[in-house]
């Protein structure tokens, strides 16, 4: 729901979806909202709501990942107290019942193993079917992802985003029973990475490394 002028009245709205173009949590920090009041939605141009945290009633799930393992395509949670270089990531929510997500090696089109990240593929009635008027092979491939050794009748939409699924156990609501759930973590777009000697890198990580290597380098410079 997009409300351009109308002020937010808690008595009128049950759930509001906001695009995370800015730091929404910081913007509303003065309102002293509960950590479960603002929820993340993983949206994609080919599917407006792939996963969501709305109505999960739990605080964001945080993991700290080994950066060296990430470069090799592996997901290795670590203790941030013992590894100060660990990357903090936050979940994007659970997969809706009418959606199927597969984490796939984008080059071999085989399912990624447990402990690996890969391209996020989606199978859902909410997915777009095609780009209007496009006959480009690249566009056709995005809507017709087939998993090697999988069901050939099932076509997936290829998001071009990297991520992984992670299983956690959390109580639902205050005093609730622990429930096992699978949540999606989104790492970023494949087009925003580059490979050197078989290792994956994000430009932002390279820039941060350069900024930390000498005190005279200005952070956030252009």
Residue ranges of each PLM-predicted region?
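Conserved ATP-binding/catalytic segment of the ANL
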Residues: 91-100, 106-115, 119-200
């Amino acid at each position: 729901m997009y409300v351009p002028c109308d002020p937010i009245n808690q008595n009128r709205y049950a759930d509001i979806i906001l695009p995370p173009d800015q730091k929404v949590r910081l913007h509303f920090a003065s309102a002293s909202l509960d950590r479960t009041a603002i929820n993340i939605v993983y949206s994609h141009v080919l599917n407006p709501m792939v996963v969501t945290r709305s109505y999960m009633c739990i605080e964001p799930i945080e993991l700290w990942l080994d950066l060296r393992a990430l470069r090799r395509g592996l997901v290795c949670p670590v203790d941030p107290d013992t590894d100060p270089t660990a990357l903090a990531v936050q979940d994007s929510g659970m997969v809706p019942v009418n959606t199927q997500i597969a984490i796939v090696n984008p080059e071999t089109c085989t399912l990624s193993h447990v402990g690996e990240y890969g391209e996020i593929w989606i199978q859902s009635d909410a997915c777009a079917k095609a780009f209007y008027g496009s006959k480009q092979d690249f566009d056709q491939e995005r809507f017709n992802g087939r998993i090697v050794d999988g069901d050939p009748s099932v076509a997936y939409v290829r998001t071009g985003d990297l991520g992984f699924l992670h299983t956690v156990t959390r109580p639902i609501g205050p005093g609730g029973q622990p429930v096992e759930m699978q949540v999606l973590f989104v790492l970023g777009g494949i087009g925003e990475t580059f490979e050197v000697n078989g290792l994956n890198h994000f430009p932002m990580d390279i820039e941060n490394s350069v900024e930390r290597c000498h005190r005279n380098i200005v952070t956030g410079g252009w």
